[in-house]
UniProtKB/Swiss-Prot annotation:
GO terms for cellular component: cytosol. The lineage of its organism: Bacteria, Bacillati, Bacillota, Bacilli, Bacillales. This is 3'-5' exonuclease DinG. Signal peptide: none annotated. The keyword Nucleotide-binding applies. It comes from the Bacteria. The nuclease activity is inhibited by ATP or ADP. Residues 8-161 form the Exonuclease domain. Changes in the ATP-binding site of the helicase domain can affect the activity of the nuclease domain. The gene is dinG. Residues 703-893 form the Helicase C-terminal domain.
Length: 897
């Protein structure tokens, strides 16, 4: 890297408006030769007020700046320190523009010769990181950042991460480094100089044996699993005893019974349903049972989970902990569908693509580094989003496999027999088909959180036609010979003429005209759907924030679909007899579009259940058309029930009305199930109270203000008495945001953090909620389950309404045809299950004490109240007004002490 000096700068300011706001703190960390050699830090005085938000974010208050210098008093000193350095910052435009403006106000012209953005560096160096926010990068890479948004600490942290990135680059194979150098020329900043120096100073040596080469790609060699050699002659009971002892867990006879029950069902190839109480530690039980089954029979077990979070917990936490506790080496692997794994031929094609797009260029560099690291080739490791994901998905769709391609899915297949425990999720379990032969290698399966299977099956059987997706897919082809795939075809035709290639002539002008007509026909199709929406009854789905049309005539839609399919067929005829790879890519894209339209057309003609969804009633671009192709019961029967010899469904909430019948009826085949109820929980009924307010008016949809005000009053009463955190669960965003707005305006909550559910941010919000002592979390259906509520004081879960799906919910509409009485057989069991899951958020260990507040009087006044009351049999129940609620809180608080 030479002896260049990097000035890693971080600024805190009064805001982000360059012409108005001021710098209030500057931190600089100087780096040379991958070593921190110096630091500089100063508070900066300003005559502007520091907004409360900035004070809260930075912990910098106005009195801290009283003795600090103004920028013009330290400008010369700072300039002298950084003038000959490479200027570095995280999101560099912000810091660079602010400091240049500050220098300019002091009559100093600052123009760094080279500029580096660490956001760019970190995206390339750490391609699998979930976030590139500085605090989350620091946590992911083991760097302590005690005070985020303080300039000195942020600058030092950025510098340490930059050093890690540079060291990682320097260890890469030379061919990879050279490709990064060439690609870096297309970046926004001066990273190419850094890569050039690394290439120039590279100590040439043979390629390390841990790597192999495919075309121009250096990739990490895949190491096959060794056949398991678990030497154990004891019983499951002794295995369980050793595990809980070494892991520091409580010995629970019922947990052992659960493990023994699962093992017995596996050994006898049975099909079983097991309800194991929430907070039971069931994952340890089924992991030990699966391991013991493998030890005794040599057969491996598939475990399907509900979420990626639980998948990760099993693979990265629970199984490694078992390995250490038992001194075993358990071969466990995440198993997905073939399309979830990378092929090196696809990466090669992406690298050769001449798309001049910044995000695509970053993606190419990420792929080059990722493929030197990944043992699995699991595409989801890359956490692709936005334009990168759309580009990548399109490349997968149009990829024509290269000769001698290296596909990582084949590694999974090759090692399947040596895997003791396979981990998958419900979506992959249901989606797997004949091509995914890895699933056929497992005869035994444990399905955790089995009550969620129908939701994933419904997603699987529902086909979608989206304006945004079709528009994007058409855009990848282009409208003229200067765009995307049409450009490649145009270049091929020119090459055919110049080089006399042995392929038939391509009618470029005809192709261009056809594509323009396809674009127009697509616009016509969605304009027709848009007109139908405007002429129909529209129902709001508040949970998903969409507007739905359930009843509509399909004649005009079918007419437009027929026209666009016909045009696609005629366009495909242009390429008859041409087998060139460029033509194959375009044909594949056109066939993808044709199949999309054709599947929807066939389903609509057959009269399958369908509905139209639109996010914004004034924007055609937000339209989606959904069609249900198959019955959920058929898919669950074929893809799950008939696939395995032994099959164990396990959940904390499988029963409804003291019976497993509601879950059994999700399969349209009369199969005998062994059923078990195992109470392994540490939960004690005396620790938990259910309070039902008597002074809250019944919910009225047209006027919910009074209902919302009552909820807020109870939150005030709870926080005033306990000073503890509270989880409030809603069935609509509208009510959630009404409560949020009221809480934010009340002085009682000035020292509370009010958090609300946000799209794709739930994991982060849960972390924040669990870290704060005084916090209120407002959430919808997502938080009714799969959420570990941590608190030192009293715990409180408030349920605004019973979690019934609205009759205008798309799920209700799609499932209606599968039941004689949809409400009794599907909606009511679903609501009771979700309610039970909500109750399960409260007590997670023997020391927890808490209270559940249910505001919905249907819990005690409806004709179906008995089904909910059954779920509360183990809880102490009390009905009363807000004064009695306060009295109960004080009693619980006294016991807690």
């Amino acid at each position: 890297m030479g002896m260049a000096t990097y000035a890693v700068v971080d600024l805190e300011t009064t805001g982000n408006q360059l012409d108005f706001d001021d710098i209030i703190q500057i931190g600089i960390t100087f780096v040379r030769n991958n070593q921190i050699i110096d630091t500089y830090h100063s508070m900066i005085r300003t005559n502007l007020e520091i907004p409360p938000f900035i004070q809260a974010l930075t912990s910098i208050e106005e009195n801290m700046l009283q003795q600090a210098p103004y920028f013009n008093q330290v400008a010369e000193e700072i300039y002298d320190k950084i003038k000959d350095c490479i200027f570095v910052a995280h999101n560099v435009d912000f810091d660079l523009n602010f400091i240049k403006k500050a220098f300019k106000d002091c009559n100093i012209q600052y123009r760094p010769k080279k500029v580096i953005d660490t956001l760019e560096i970190f995206k390339i160096a750490f391609p699998t990181d979930k976030s590139y926010q500085l605090s989350e990068l620091a946590e992911a890479h083991g760097i302590t950042l005690a005070n985020a948004h303080r300039a000195d600490e942020d600058a030092a942290t950025t510098a340490k991460l930059m050093i890690l990135a540079f060291e990682k680059f320097e260890k890469l194979p030379l061919d990879t480094l050279k490709q990064l150098y060439y690609l870096s020329k297309q970046l926004k900043y001066d990273l190419y100089d850094i890569f050039f120096e690394m290439v120039r100073q590279y100590d040439a040596k043979p390629l390390d044996k841990s790597y192999e080469k495919f075309e121009q790609i250096i990739y990490r060699k895949q190491v096959d699993f060794k056949k398991p050699t678990t030497n154990y002659n004891g019983s499951l009971k002794s295995l369980y005893s050793k595990a809980v002892d070494q892991l520091g867990l409580t010995y629970r006879p019922q947990q052992l019974y659960l493990a023994e029950t699962i093992l017995d069902q596996l050994m006898h190839s049975e099909k079983a349903m097991i309800e194991a109480s929430l907070g039971s530690g069931k994952s340890l039980a089924y992991l030990l049972a699966a391991l013991m089954y493998n030890i005794e029979t040599g057969k491996h077990v598939m475990i399907s989970t509900n979420t990626k979070l639980l998948q990760s917990q099993l693979l990265e936490k629970d199984i490694p902990a078992m390995n250490e506790a038992l001194n075993f080496k358990i071969n466990a692997l995440l198993i997905k569908s073939k399309s979830d794994y990378i092929s090196l031929g696809l990466i090669s094609q992406i690298l050769k693509d001449d798309t001049s797009n910044y995000e695509v260029n970053i993606l190419k560099m990420q792929l080059l580094i990722w493929i030197t690291e990944t043992p699995s080739g699991d595409i989801q490791e890359l956490n692709l989003k936005g334009g990168q994901k759309m580009y990548f998905d399109q490349k997968i769709e149009t990829y024509v496999p290269a000769r001698h391609d290296v596909h990582y899915y084949n590694f999974i297949k090759r090692n399947a027999q040596n895997i003791q425990i396979g981990i998958t999720n419900h979506a992959h379990l249901i989606h797997s088909d004949v091509e995914n032969s890895i699933y056929q290698l497992f005869d035994d399966c444990i399905v955790d959180e089995a009550h969620r299977l129908p939701d994933y099956a419904l997603n699987q059987v529902t086909n979608e036609l989206s304006y945004a997706d079709i528009k994007y897919q058409l855009g990848l082809i282009g409208k003229n010979e200067n765009e995307k795939l049409l450009k490649a075809i145009d270049q091929l035709e020119k090459q055919r003429i110049l080089e006399k290639l042995d392929i038939a002539p391509i009618d470029i002008f005809g192709l261009k005209a056809s594509m323009n007509e396809i674009h127009e026909l697509n616009e016509q199709l969605f304009s027709t759907i848009f007109t139908i929406i405007n002429d129909s009854d529209v129902y709001d789905d508040d949970i998903h924030r969409f507007h739905n049309v359930f009843t509509f005539e399909t004649k005009d839609i079918l007419k437009d679909l027929h026209a666009i399919i016909d045009k696609l067929n005629k366009t495909l005829e242009i390429f008859n007899g041409i087998s060139h790879k460029t033509v194959k890519s375009l044909r594949k894209q056109l066939l993808y579009l044709k199949d999309k339209f054709k599947n929807i057309e066939q389903s609509l003609k057959a009269g399958h259940t369908s509905f139209i969804s639109i996010k914004n009633l004034s924007q055609k671009s937000t339209i989606r058309l959904y069609v249900k192709d198959y019955a959920v019961k058929d898919v669950l029967t074929k893809q799950v029930l008939e696939k395995f010899k032994s099959l164990i469904f396990i959940s904390g909430t499988l029963k409804f009305n003291h019976s497993f019948d509601a879950f059994k009826q999700l399969f349209n085949k009369d199969v005998h199930f062994n059923t078990f109820e195992v109470n392994t929980s540490l939960q004690s009924a005396k620790n938990t109270s259910v309070f039902i307010p008597s002074d809250v008016a019944s919910y009225q949809y047209k006027n919910i203000d009074e209902y919302v005000a009552s909820i807020v009053s109870y939150i005030i009463e709870y926080t005033t008495i306990t000073s503890s955190k509270c989880l409030v669960l809603f069935t609509s965003y509208k009510m959630m945001h009404m409560v949020q707005d009221m809480l934010n305006e009340l002085p009682e909550f000035e020292d509370y953090v009010v958090l609300t559910q946000q799209q794709n941010q739930n994991y982060k919000i849960v972390q924040q909620f669990n870290n704060f002592d005084k916090a209120i979390l407002l959430g919808t259906s997502t938080f009714f389950e799969g959420f570990d509520f941590q608190a030192n004081g009293i715990k409180c879960v408030m349920i605004a309404k019973l979690p019934f799906m609205n009759k205008h919910n798309a799920k209700y509409w799609l499932m209606d045809s599968e039941f004689t009485s949809t409400f009794k057989e599907y909606v009511l069991p679903d609501a009771v299950t979700r309610f039970r899951q909500g109750l399960g958020r409260l007590i997670r260990n023997e020391n927890d004490r808490g209270i559940i507040v249910s505001f919905d009087d249907r819990l005690i006044n409806s004709n179906y109240k008995n089904f909910f009351e059954q779920t509360l049999e183990n809880y102490r129940q009390k009905k009363g007004d807000i004064q009695q609620f306060g009295k109960l809180l004080r009693q619980i608080q006294k016991k807690k002490k």
